[in-house]
Amino acid sequence: PLPPSLPSLPAWRRCRASTCSQGCCLAAVGSRRCTTPPRSPHECASRATSAGSASTPRRSSSCSRPPSIRTTLKLGWAAGKVFEEEGIKAIVIGKDTRISGYMLETALQSGIIAAGMDVRLVGPMPTPAVSYLASSFKNQAGVVISASHNSYEDNGIKFFGDDGKKISDELEERIEKKLSEEIVVVSAKKLGKAARISDASGRYIEFCKSCLQRNINFNQLKIVLDVANGAAYDVAPKVFKELGAEIIVLSNQPDGTNINKNCGSTDIKLLQKEVIKNKADFGIAFDGDGDRLIFVDENAIELNGDDILYVLARDKFENQITLGSKGIVGTIMTNKGLEISLTKMGVDLIRTDVGDRHVLQKLEELNWDLGGEQSGHIISLDSSNSGDAIIAAIKFLEAYVCSDLPMKDLLNPLVKYPQILVNLKTDNPEKILKSKSFKKLVN
């Protein structure tokens, strides 16, 4: 039985000001904000956790950790209470393949059940799958236990509303406020119930396949998939196989500790090697939670989010597929060459801060449907209400097949400008960004 109350714990807050170059939120506990910059484009700083998630901070690279069991249990209870006020009847819980995910899943569902809310378990599933499942059921929210592209030692928790979108700042703050209260377990009669959604992966696979908009298949394609020993290890191969592609699968033996290890979208060397070895048309690398991807062409050349956005925008423009107001949303990291190439096609580019959350907000504000990040987060609101790597891959391959062009020719008009990423360690980023010397340097 759960204790009737637990000591008050420090509140969690996602730092809304600081993000690494891959869009990962730098976590903080209480009101302390993390100001440590990322060490590299693909590696978050000492306090980094998964994007949009709650977590305890990493104390050092040798002593990193997921949220504590007590924190997770209380977070589940607090979220259950707040979602109940919103009319939510159940919460779908998914996770990636980290070993700590099983521990956190148990603690989280215990807290939710103690709040009187039902739980629906789906096991290891891509983050976008949980988003889809939450929105496909009536009055059900979603929770994902993942640290995205980080190593297995880290973990985090992120919430989705019944619309499948990440919860608002206002809802987040209400959960945080509820954390300051003592846990009060509902009566035995009102306790929530836990059940497993047995056909969760099948539902999501069929949804992904339905996003192929034209009457084509991938029968002529040979594709190497690197599923990063992560959340997409089971569903991604099935999707592309059922769409007709010949597939070779890499990094699909998760053991709890090998997620993102020398594989996936943050390390594509093995994928490049296997594409050449197998004479494949493409290689596709997913990240640990399946919301980000990187392509590799037949010559093992990397195609990042900017390349993917260009191909998708060109397909929409030339084939007169709905593109809202003929514009796409990128970020401050988006290559200038993409902006110039889009302008020549009559397609506008609007930039936001780094982070798929910012991209999604701008898309909704402008009523556009396509946006993304250089890191491989691609959002297609005409098919999904969140960034989904599998759907992005389907759309990219669809555009390629329908173009009837070699990839080199399809991308030929896109001339990317050289980019250099420099991380500056500072405790006052606003002062630097507003300084005359910095503006002069950038301009």
Language model segments and positions:
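Glycine-rich phosphate-binding loop
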Residues: 139-154, 275-297, 301-302, 347-388
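Low-acidity, Ser/Thr- and Arg-rich intrinsically disordered low-complexity segments
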Residues: 5-25, 31-40, 44-66
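Proline/glycine-rich low-complexity loops and linkers
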Residues: 129, 173-206, 210, 298-372, ...
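Phosphate-binding and adjacent anionic-ligand microenvironments
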Residues: 319, 323-443
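An N-terminal, well-structured beta->alpha segment
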Residues: 59-60, 64-110, 114-115, 194-221, ...
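N-terminal small/polar loop signature for handling phosphorylated ligands or for N-terminal nucleophile
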Residues: 81, 88-154, 238-296
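Gly/Ser/Thr-enriched, mixed-charge loops and adjacent short helices
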Residues: 155-276
